[in-house]
Amino acid sequence: MIRKAFVMQVNADAHEEYQRRHNPIWPELEAVLKSHGAHHYAIYLDQERNLLFATVEIESEERWNAVASTDVCQRWWKHMRDVMPANPDNSPASAELKEVFYLQ
């Protein structure tokens, strides 16, 4: 498995709405993530700084990257763009983090 971590932001007035939209996520989005090899996907909120910290384990970079081109992912991004900063293609503005320590 490949471990990934990344950060995003959520609008200061949208913490509750962001959480509501994820509980639960759309079943078809969950199915796409799982079918593309995503496991143990978690998102944490730093309420003071409006930061989201996400971790996920993936089976391959290619399969993970392919999620972005699915119809359900495109619809999800559009659904979320009003509660968080987004790129021109509606994907969440994010930065991948480099792993510097791991204890198994």
Curated annotation (Swiss-Prot):
Example GO molecular function: L-rhamnose mutarotase activity
* EC number(s) given by UniProt: 5.1.3.32
Report the record's Gene Ontology biological process terms: rhamnose catabolic process
Q: Extract one GO cellular component term from the record.
A: cytoplasm
Q: Where is the active site?
A: H22 (proton donor)
Its UniProt pathway annotation is: Carbohydrate metabolism; L-rhamnose metabolism
SUPFAM superfamilies from the UniProt entry: Dimeric alpha+beta barrel
Q: Gene3D superfamilies recorded for this chain? A: 3.30.70.100
For this UniProt record, the keywords arranged alphabetically read as follows: Carbohydrate metabolism, Cytoplasm, Isomerase, Rhamnose metabolism
InterPro entries with a match to the protein in the record:
Dimeric_a/b-barrel, L-rhamnose_mutarotase, Rham/fucose_mutarotase
Question: What is the annotated quaternary arrangement, including any partners?
Answer: Homodimer.
* PANTHER family per record: L-RHAMNOSE MUTAROTASE (PTHR34389:SF2)
Protein family per UniProt: Belongs to the rhamnose mutarotase family.
Q: What does this protein do?
A: Involved in the anomeric conversion of L-rhamnose.
What name is this protein filed under? L-rhamnose mutarotase
